[in-house]
Amino acid sequence: MSLEVNITKKLDGFILHANFAARSTATAILGASGCGKSMTLRCIAGIVKPDAGRIVLDGRVLFDSAQHIDLPPQQRGVGLLFQNYALFPNMTVEQNVLCGLKAEKDKAARKARCAEMLQAMRLESLAKRYPAQLSGGQQQRTALARILVGRPKILMLDEPFSALDSYLREEVEGEVGSLLAGFGGTVLLVTHNRDEAYRLCRDMIVMDGGQVLRTGGTKEVFADPQSTTAARLTGCKNILSCTRVDAHTVRLTGWDAPLRLAAEVPETCTAVGIRAHDFAPCAPAAPNALPVQLNSTSENPFDWNLIFTAPDGTTRLWWKVSKTNLTAASPEAPAFLGTAPQNIMPLG
């Protein structure tokens, strides 16, 4: 299975231009709220009509404005789990799942397929319960079963964990991760949570303001986001202005110090990204050594955040230090921090 999307849609405040391809794996669409992620899913599902463009799923045209093709949602083979999914409260789990088989007219076939899905989603013992009698995780499994029972060619999840309490989120995420791994087709997962995207998806699409900024393998995008916006969305705390010196050297604003990069520095480079865990104390003469002055310290359950300022007193630099145990003391603030050339990401 593969998905090709190239559409435009005028929205309030910006024009959505979604142009990407997704293969038969789980692909995250990462972006801030209101950037067009969810609208992209609705256009693929046929709920919203794009102004122009083309959508092709596994060689089958779902939408083509030039050829006046616009298949209705029920003919697209698309399964979409909304952020605020709703189960029918007056129906049992089994009855809710059967709603996903309305196109199947054979009653015996419907019953057999429903039983198969209840078993696959570990809902057999809950089949006669009503939604109000289920936990949040059980409700979500039921909603997914209702979608999957119809054997969609593509599965799309819109912020599937946002409504769950934090203690439940990891449990449900693990269950969904196993489901995605066994789906066998294209999966699109819309999220603004970089950790969810990293754990669950092999590929990633980064969006901002209706535009696709970056596509590629998830680890590849994290290692080389290419733009300052994509770097921020993937959690990079240190985005430092710079000027290009040569193909592998920049000069940092605020430090007036050179940094050597392993990656080639493009002519368009205006900043570099360094992740907060990638710094380490170093000697003044060490390569890529930066003089720093401690500004503040904060403690998390499993790490410390140390925020420094540059010699100019304005530029901030984050250093995250993992704890060896919960009672570990705050690390001593160094006078110099350094990082390896391969940890520095050129950004445009």
Name what the model sees in each region.
Residues 5-26, 30-32, 38-39, 46-49, ...:
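Non-catalytic connector elements of ABC transporters
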Residues 48-49, 56, 102, 181:
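A position-specific signal in ABC ATPase nucleotide-binding domains
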Residues 77-79, 90-229:
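ABC ATPase nucleotide-binding domains
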Residues 38-41, 141-142:
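ABC ATPase nucleotide-binding domain helices that frame the ATP-binding cleft
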Residues 42-43, 203:
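The short alpha-helix immediately C-terminal to the Walker A/P-loop
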Residues 28, 70-72, 76-86, 188:
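ABC nucleotide-binding domain signature
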